[in-house]
Regions:
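Extracytoplasmic and endomembrane cell-envelope/extracellular-matrix remodeling and assembly machinery
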Residues: 155-199, 208, 212, 216-231, ...
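Extracellular repeat-rich scaffold modules on cell surfaces
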Residues: 229, 233-307
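Low-complexity acidic/polar repeat-biased segments
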Residues: 163, 250-251, 260, 268, ...
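Acidic, glycine-rich calcium-binding repeat modules characteristic of RTX/beta-roll
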Residues: 74-84, 107-125, 131, 143-167, ...
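Residue-level detector of conserved, well-ordered beta-strand and adjacent loop positions
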Residues: 35, 64, 140, 205, ...
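Acidic glycine-/aspartate-rich tracts in secreted/extracellular proteins
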Residues: 38-41, 68, 99-103, 144-146, ...
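Metzincin-family zinc-dependent endopeptidase catalytic domain
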Residues: 2-150, 156, 208-212, 216-254
Length: 392
């Protein structure tokens, strides 16, 4: 029951859909029904649901109890959030409110996921750009068969989606509109740091406050990417994963839009800050004004396109990737000339330097793009690379 309640809350948190508990009343206003079945009635499936418009059973959600409990009601498998079996409840509820599998054509011959056909292997084929898989959508059957390095290759008690994926969120918002008031405070999203029961992936839909993804307790390298899912024909359609190395779990960030126009940012779902840990981390910003703090280790910090970013590498040999574009400005607060490097994706001759009190201003074609605090000179040969941004 709690998993179904959590599933309903998860859908309401991101969309305009709301659920009202009418108890056991059997009347025409009831849109969703929940049942438990045994193995014989469920035909061996984990569960099933009837989508709107199917027949008189539309809105029915059935869970095969025998897949989860023994005959004396003892648990067979973990159903903790993030477990292989735990996602069934959210998966089936999504069907009941109108979402289909990416690999099939639904009731009315809707398009399959890009790159899939009726001959595709529904358990292994992740489609175009490998996005038909966890952690990008929980409606897929490509979970432990994804082999993408983000999720386990067996039915584990951790490592899979705990929530809707970014692609699921977009589909629900297209149907029901967005929830513009979700997580509107100052939120901190802490990276999971171990492969233990109940850990897994979450897609963030956060519409307010100054927020941060935090990996400060990590002993292993972390990647924190503040960019939103693109929903485009690319390998970031379902999001840019943020996680600790070797851990199956972390975050993606849902597409930032108003539920109507995919091509324009609504400025709602924005995560502003990132904090690394004690190893060599990779921190990537977005179009907002970001504060990126690498802490220990040899870190890479990239403020992204747009905004006034503040970059702090911390101890170690750090790289600061500086975007040369109008409207984007990075302040590097702790550049260590004997250790650190700047990286640009433009030619050396397009850049110039000028002193500003105790700081050094960097300009691209006379447009200010960066300020090095407490630095009075720069050695172009040893402290600067013009290799571009590899791996973005």
């Amino acid at each position: 029951r709690q998993l179904l309640l959590d599933a309903m809350q998860g859908i309401a948190d991101v969309s305009g859909l709301r659920f009202i508990d009418r108890g056991d009343n059997n009347d025409d206003n009831v849109e969703l029904w929940f049942y438990t079945l045994d193995r014989r009635d469920a035909d061996g499936s984990y569960g099933f649901a009837y989508t709107p418009g199917s027949d008189f059973d539309e809105g029915l959600v059935a869970i095969n109890r025998s897949m989860y409990q023994t005959s004396d009601f003892k648990p067979k498998h973990s159903i903790a959030p993030g477990s292989f079996y735990g996602i069934t409840f959210l998966h089936e509820l999504c069907h009941a409110v109108g979402l289909k599998h990416p690999h099939d054509s639904g009731l009315k011959q809707q398009p399959r996921f890009p790159g899939l056909t009726r001959r595709s292997n529904q358990y292994r084929d992740s489609g175009m750009f490998n996005q038909n898989a966890h952690p990008f959508t929980q409606l897929t059957y490509v979970d432990k068969g994804a082999r993408n390095g983000y999720v386990p290759t067996a039915a584990a008690d951790h490592g899979f989606l705990q929530t809707l994926g970014a692609l699921d969120i977009a589909a629900l918002q297209w149907l029901y509109g967005i929830n513009p008031n979700a997580s509107s405070g100052r939120d901190v999203y802490r990276l999971p740091l171990s492969n233990t029961e109940g850990m897994g992936w979450r897609a963030i839909w956060d519409t307010g406050g100054i927020d941060r993804i935090d990996g400060s307790l990590a002993e292993m390298p972390v990647t924190i990417d503040l960019r939103n899912a693109t929903l485009g024909q690319d390998d970031a359609a379902g999001g840019y994963p943020s996680s600790a190395e070797g851990v199956f779990g972390g975050f993606t960030i849902a597409h930032d839009w108003n539920g109507v126009d995919l091509t324009e940012s609504a400025g709602l779902c924005i995560i502003e800050h990132a904090t690394g840990g004690r190893a060599g981390d990779r921190l990537i910003g977005n179009q907002a004004s970001n504060r990126l703090r690498g802490r220990r280790g040899d870190d890479v910090l990239y403020g992204g396109l747009g905004g006034k970013d503040r970059l702090v590498g911390g101890p170690g040999r750090d790289q600061f990737w500086i975007e040369a574009v109008s409207g984007s400005f990075a302040t590097v607060r702790d550049f260590q000339p004997e250790l650190d490097q700047l990286v640009f994706d433009v030619p050396r001759e397009s850049l110039s330097l000028s002193s500003q009190a105790d700081d050094l201003l960097i300009q691209w074609r006379d447009i200010p793009i960066a300020l090095l605090k407490g630095v009075d000179s720069l050695d172009w040969s040893s402290q600067v690379l013009f290799s571009g941004f590899q791996g973005l």
